[in-house]
Amino acid sequence: MATAAAASNKFESFFETTLEDADPEIFGAIRNELGRQRHEIELIASENIVSRAVLEAQGSIMTNKYAEGYPGKRYYGGCQFVDVAEELAIERAKKLFGCNFANVQPNSGSQMNQAVFLALLQPGDTFMGLDLNSGGHLTHGSPVNMSGKWFKVVSYGVRKEDHLLDMDAIEKTAHETKPKLILAGGTAYSRIWDWKRFREIADAVGAYLMVDMAHIAGLVAGGVHPSPLPHAHVVTTTTHKSLRGPRGGMILCNDEDIAKKMNSAVFPGLQGGPLMHVIAAKAVAFGEALKPSFKVYAESVAANAKALASSLKETGLDIVSGGTDNHLMLVDLRPKNATGKRAEAALGRANITCNKNGIPFDPEKPFVTSGVRLGTPAGTTRGFGQAEFREIGKLIAEVLDGLKIANSDEGNAAVEAAVKAKVVALTDRFPLYPYLG
């Protein structure tokens, strides 16, 4: 009896011991990260803040279940309830974006794009993608990425005079190189994409049109940016960023044959068992995005971006392409004699989080850069409006002006401390996850 009682107590401990007691080091890191998120202004364009419901789904017992395959066609038993979660995620994604097919299993943005390449291309095939220096992504053909190693990549870019896509030049290049696939979309392009023109170019050369809308999916869902689904053969998107869900990816399309190829490419082509706790959280996020309040959110994200860009321009900074039509902007720091590396560090010391980013035709090295990329999704989720983002623009300028005076990597401690105090006062007005204590 004593042995049985001891065994029972051991298992009770396993199931009931809190993270704080079981692993104080990880618990401490999580609490510190919560404090950072609460007291810093998050301007990284690819980041957002999920709801309590999404957190609960992602932290659920769904993490225990293996479910190789697809709903109704699994290689494991006991999948009847995870099937419900995945089917809900699929149906909600289809409704949200008005498409016929959705694969919600990709674990990341890189994997969703790899799946499309696996489905539609052969090694050595030619595809076109936006150059990294013009706002593209590593998976759009960068030579250091699989996409640039396995395929012949023809990059297109923006015009030097206005930093906008030159559709005539893209069309000319497509006719000259005859790509099998044209990839539209990017991570640092702040203007509206002309999906219709891209499809016309693709059709003229017999290419697939693939759109990576990872950054703007939330704006598409909210009706703020035109949808690529009526035009593209296949669309990929992450489920976080402006869509405000858990970190992951998905693939959307309207053609049944392409959908079958995508499903085979994801599983068994690239992945094994899907992350069912993440898929459950995706379903929750898609359900949130289907509510009328999400349209208001998306509209606010875009309006706040315009307010921030306008405020920054008033302080003497340049915005690449002159402004923004979506959630992000590239800020040219050269008017303040700053580099992206120095600015990111100085702003970080003032509790403003962003990332250094190259600008088109940047003379600086990739780890230095002449710019920073800023975005409004996380701040908008928190409750910031246009007034707050105009204030944030001024705070950024204060830090950069102090940095210009100091002219060193160490920055201007007095200015940064003063701005940090203002940032904390602002964030305290918009509490984050108060139920966590």
Swiss-Prot record:
Domain of life: Bacteria
Keywords annotated in UniProt: Amino-acid biosynthesis, Cytoplasm, One-carbon metabolism, Pyridoxal phosphate, Transferase
GO cellular component, one term: cytosol
Record-annotated disulphide pairs: none
Modified positions (N6-(pyridoxal phosphate)lysine) in chain numbering: 241
Reactions this protein catalyses: (6R)-5,10-methylene-5,6,7,8-tetrahydrofolate + glycine + H2O = (6S)-5,6,7,8-tetrahydrofolate + L-serine
Chief place where the protein resides: cytoplasm
Name of protein: Serine hydroxymethyltransferase 1
